[in-house]
Amino acid sequence: MRTLLFATLVLAASICFPNGAAGDNIARGVKVVVIDAGHGGPKFPGAHYRGVYEKDLNLKVALRLGRLIEDNLPGIKVVYTRKTDKQFSDNLSLDLQARADIANKAGGDLFISIHTNAARSASAKGVETLIMGESTTETRRNEDVLYAYNKEELIDMADAKTAAIVRAYIQNLQFTYGEYSEAMARLVQKNYGKFSRQDRGVKRQLLKAVSYTHLRAHET
């Protein structure tokens, strides 16, 4: 049986309000936050179970998160990739590119893509945050969430030329934003822990959507 791993609004909200010096340092300089509700439209509903679709859950969380930022952090502009149930193309790569284009055009400082994963096992639970990079052996070994990542949303590294380009991009990304992205991701996970949710940790994945953006980014 396949079950959804539900992300709650209060957990998503926690990433907006980091406490202490670490949070202040990470939040400094963020003026535009781009929030992406993952999936959308009839062709890309995402994970689903008994009439509940990931695309709808993601949108509710994204809109709620945006309102919390706007109400509590008036100095930060919020930009959404979508505010309704929509897709940008019947081609998934073009759909992801369109979301990244919105973020790039907005001059975003931070890109947050919200997803709700699914698994065959009813015992699978918890929250995780993804940043751009290649999976570690430990991450691959612990991927018990079978449907966590749509393969079409990941970069295919089978082609040597593509792999070389992607690894060069990752190296540049880590030099520019890597430390920030990982620090933000760990802060997100730390705040999730306040609500007694199982911490699945920060993981690296070769995410197409993130590779198209020119800003600090993570998926949660």
Regions from the PLM with identified roles:
Residues 157-166, 183, 192-212:
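Short catalytic/ligand-gating loop segments at beta-alpha or beta-beta junctions
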